[in-house]
């Protein structure tokens, strides 16, 4: 398959429970700081041909592309943790959910102001995430001036 073309099956879709589980696990895979554990999580929830369209306009392909990109972001976000913000929304084989990045240790403190706020939109095929879009609504540009670069 060409990197310029993505095919999606439209005949069937997963249950809402499967979709919610996948988007929650998508957000949580950033909690794996060990690259081998993160790669195992990536392989469990993402299709081999995953395409990730990230907030800065970059595109990443396959399990190795997700591992490389997530490693770069985690290196930039040392001392911070991802957490889900609210619930997931599901429509057939598409799901969306919001997330935040907060200082490590403050994940349960919902008064903690996040340094990044964003969300993910994903498309699932055969119980694996096939396409992922990540967007950022707000981030601390002083603290994270080179985020994603």
List each model region and its residues.
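General structural signal for alpha-helix termini and helix-helix connectors
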Residues: 32, 52-55, 106
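A solvent-exposed, acidic/Ser-Thr-rich amphipathic alpha-helical stretch
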Residues: 37-93
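A beta-strand edge to alpha-helix "cap/lid" segment located at domain peripheries
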Residues: 2-13, 18, 73-149
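Compositionally biased, intrinsically disordered low-complexity regions enriched in proline and serine
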Residues: 30-33, 61-64, 81, 136, ...
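Short, low-complexity N-terminal intrinsically disordered segments enriched in polar/charged residues
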Residues: 1-45
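Hydrophobic alpha-helical core bundles mediating ligand binding, dimerization, or RNAP-core interactions
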Residues: 23-30, 46, 70, 97-101, ...
């Amino acid at each position: 398959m060409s990197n310029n073309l993505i095919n999606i099956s439209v005949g069937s879709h997963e249950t809402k429970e499967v979709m919610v589980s996948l988007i929650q696990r998508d957000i949580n895979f950033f909690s794996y700081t060990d690259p081998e554990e993160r790669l195992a999580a990536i392989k469990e929830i993402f299709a081999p041909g995953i395409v990730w369209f990230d907030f800065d306009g970059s595109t990443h392909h396959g399990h190795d592309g997700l591992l490389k990109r997530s490693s770069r972001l985690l290196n930039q976000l040392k001392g911070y943790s991802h957490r889900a913000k609210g619930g997931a929304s599901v429509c057939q084989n598409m799901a969306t959910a919001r997330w935040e990045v907060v200082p490590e240790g403050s994940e349960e403190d919902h008064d903690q102001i996040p340094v990044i706020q964003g969300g993910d939109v994903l498309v699932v095929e055969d119980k694996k995430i096939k396409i992922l879009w990540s967007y950022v609504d707000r981030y601390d540009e002083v603290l994270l001036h080179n985020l994603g670069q």
